[in-house]
């Protein structure tokens, strides 16, 4: 904010300023520091380079923070600074907060720095980064403290000065040597020799003994790039970043001298190996152990799995780093004291290259002044962006406008200067200076606290020492992914004596931070320091302290990607969980506990949120997100539970800055290590395995969602994404067929844009997960009801498992699921087998046994045979019913056991005026393993657009039931086989139930466990029984579950006791339906009686289609006389009824294979025309009818269509087609529900004769079928059953039977009652 505004607001102490400060205190990019917590320091977030969040930029823009980059080009640094509101200034400008340079700094430039300005190099840092100076410093330390204490470099000689010594050493050991220029990088000028004559002495070079026993991974040599941050040389403060890079050679290692010139084998520099044709790059940031560049944590995890002691290895690495920096500490600290006006002005990031031999001893290769920050792979970006962001946070950029330079004034300003600093918190009454206030606070708190605590003895410290002590502690609070390796209580005892820069700051820092260590530990550390001074002993695991083990666990954990943190920030969970870097609320509270105890609590805690990689679409954290609310478990618990991979997550901070004594009193909380439990003969229950699989699928859905935008659409990326989406599509196709519940698959077409396909696929995967979770819950409820105690014993602790699922990453879940699958030798528990397989305990009965609501209409997928896939027709709208590959068709059914009478209860609740016509086509299968399909229907007609709303939404109380007809398929035997796909869910009997009642002697159902079958054994007879039960319920207007169950069981036992003949219940039915001439009748009657909003269209998909017309349109539409007459009575064709009943009874099988004729195609084309002309006048429809009658006049159609229509609101239309031959005799009867119409063929001109004919035929009908019905017919009053045959038993002209919905007292009087009712109402049949 402007300076004037800051002054005015401070003087007036306005409420707006207080609100602004309150907002800043809560800002995720602000941490308040200083004695009174009035100095804002910027906190960096690596994910900001992806989110472009204005909330992150606003702080930098408000304070006009700026930077300049000199003699280098780092896109990563520029991107991170720009994302946080920094703006770049000219390299010659002096108004900047950060100067990032790629070269050493001149002394005059350092002298001009203000305390708020920072540069990324120390003066004389070449003492470390030049190979000759590093060698000289190490040699000096070896001479001073012993060769073994600083034996961190291979044997080295500086040529040409030490050429004679080199030749002398070579004569003793003629192994290979490596030559390096003293001031080069990236492997330039490096080569191997095996003879001194091969060396050129024209320039200064370094010759080192080649380490010919390197540690190999898969026979490849590698080294490790470590990132070391030094924030001060006086006192010396060293941080090591928890993540690094393992760089591999591209040629397998061979010690033979013939390969000595092969740089791709012996050099591991990325700049060298990237030129190799064998270089492999990994494009997935989540995969860290693939290709020629691994993460250091992945390398450590691999070594740990191989049985290597990674704790000792990393302890050796820390030892090497500390000794290396100490060797140059004197020269650099002296230069800083001479040239740098402020202790906090400089910082430096070093790149340590370390080679590990096969004894796990690390060797220092070189130290890089400006380690490469190029991001050539996603893994580079993840590691380096996190590291740079954490480094900037540790360094601490004060939010101060660089134009308001205070020169050499203290950052803790006087009263006058504070009025000009906008970042300073206002205070109404202030002492002489902020520093004095800090001192008084410290002294006052020291007097109040118990002696022996840290804050109790600040007396005697100078102002400068107090500020240094506070700054070091605040840096440690902001360290993020950096680990302070010096000073710590252990490293100070070991390496303190090596420091050569004898100032009071190092000693003060150590004594104030670690003064109250316990006597036993102090004696142990003193002994270690003494032995180390005498001979630099080998570091062993037995002597490792707790902090070393914790550090090893930190190095092994996996760093979270930027995308993960981006999703968390987007969901707002980062601020909701905790402030990023909690600060002690009052300065006095830092006196409660010693720095040593505080550090232990901060570093020992477990970071639970590090493992939250995508438990839902937003559940992941970034590397900065590692610093969540902390816990303080004991060391033994942490070490015992540290996983092989990266489950160990260590916290960095105390919880919300609360006093450490409160945290100390908390109970230790151990980390739940699921993989360890599984490896120790533990196991998951089936429900737990499904929960883990569901969480894994949610991670996959997150990846699909997050990548749907913001990507560079390169061909390689598009090909990769297409391949991954294809895997998900194949999974959904296979897995959805195993679901017991319905699932509508709308898989995206490959013609769509890539990002649109990802969006649709992510949505479909989400739907699948929802249904999958429902089934898992039902499984859990079912097991809990049955009290399966063995399942509980097999599973792990439920609460711990839920916590693991919530926090686990995708990689961890994948590892657990893979191990579980291998252990149980099956993955069927995740998806099960075919839930609708042909078993008696199929999902038809299972789904209804769960107590689901009977009003829920669901969708079932039927897997089609492979021979039919080629002919399956796929339109865009057709995908609502079938998957994009055509392997699955769908069928709507009520969610009850075996389609039983709960559906009738639904219809009882519906008003009679809203009941749609209910009629179904019998399509029972005549052979095992054959499914319904209408794939032979031509693809000319589009499917109806209103389908999804019907299929997905539950049926309301005032909505009529849907009739869903099945499909047919040609069997290998050449017979038209049909599976029942049409079920009447109403209280009135349907065509199928009537056929069953009048035949009674049906053939054995033939769906016996055929490959790909999705129907139970007793599916067909069970359907008829269900219809029967439904009628009973409708008659009594009540639903009795026990009565229905008993009746179903009784009928099933009677049916099973009969002798069945194979394939006799379908043959003549299919023959008769195919011989009906529907060309004129369907067109005529649909045009005459059907309102435009209800006229049907045949879908090329062939399963079932239903539409829900506009209620207003259907209610207000004026119906023609024929339509009104249809509302008063039901129609059915006599000949078809007789044919179908006879075919069920006799079981005559047709002898020729069904082949659709041209007439059937023309019929469907006519129906398509009707759909397209539904809003036109009746005159146009009559013309269309006449045209098609002329076409089909001389042809016999092999298909017939049964149309169910109703003019009432909310009615639904269903259709089915079947094919077959014309039978000889046609004993059959049908009953149509009220307010329904069956339009099959053109009726005869004399309707009264049609009505009288069934009465005379009834006497000649065989009594065997009726005798079996006498016990049940009395309960079926709502419908009239009228068998119709002619004298010859063959089909004559199509006839119509009218069945009333009013209950009839007896079956014998049904016909007379119907005729009497129609006469009394004077209903004219007319042309329909």
From Swiss-Prot:
Annotated Mg(2+) 2 binding sites: 366, 368
Location of region: c-MTBD region: 378-488
GO BP annotations, alphabetical order: fertilization; flagellated sperm motility; protein modification process; retina development in camera-type eye; sperm axoneme assembly; spermatogenesis
Tree of life domain: Eukaryota
Binding site for ATP: 180, 186-187, 208-211, 221-223, 268-269
Pfam families, per the entry: TTL
First-listed, main subcellular location of the protein, grouped into a coarse class: other
InterPro entries in the cross-refs: TTL/TTLL_fam
Positions contributing to Mg(2+) 1 binding: 353, 366
Subcellular location: Cell projection, Cilium; Cytoplasm, Cytoskeleton, Cilium basal body; Nucleus; Cytoplasm
Chain spans, region Disordered: 1-22, 411-436, 585-631, 834-853, 948-975, 1006-1032, 1085-1129, 1212-1271
Enzyme nomenclature, EC number: 6.3.2.-
Biased composition (Low complexity): 838-847
Catalytic activity: L-glutamyl-[protein] + L-glutamate + ATP = gamma-L-glutamyl-L-glutamyl-[protein] + ADP + phosphate + H(+); (L-glutamyl)(n)-gamma-L-glutamyl-L-glutamyl-[protein] + L-glutamate + ATP = (L-glutamyl)(n+1)-gamma-L-glutamyl-L-glutamyl-[protein] + ADP + phosphate + H(+)
Cofactor: Mg(2+)
GO cellular component: 9+0 non-motile cilium; ciliary basal body; cilium; cytoplasm; microtubule; nucleus
Composition bias, Polar residues: 420-432, 1116-1128, 1214-1227, 1234-1248, 1257-1271
Keywords attached to this entry: ATP-binding, Cell projection, Cilium, Cytoplasm, Cytoskeleton, Ligase, Magnesium, Metal-binding, Microtubule, Nucleotide-binding, Nucleus, Transcription
Annotated binding of a protein, by residue: 186
Subunit and interaction comment: Interacts with the transcriptional coactivators NCOA1/SRC-1 and NCOA2/TIF2.
Protein family according to the UniProt entry: Belongs to the tubulin--tyrosine ligase family.
Protein name per its UniProtKB record: Tubulin polyglutamylase TTLL5
Taxonomic lineage: Eukaryota, Metazoa, Chordata, Craniata, Vertebrata
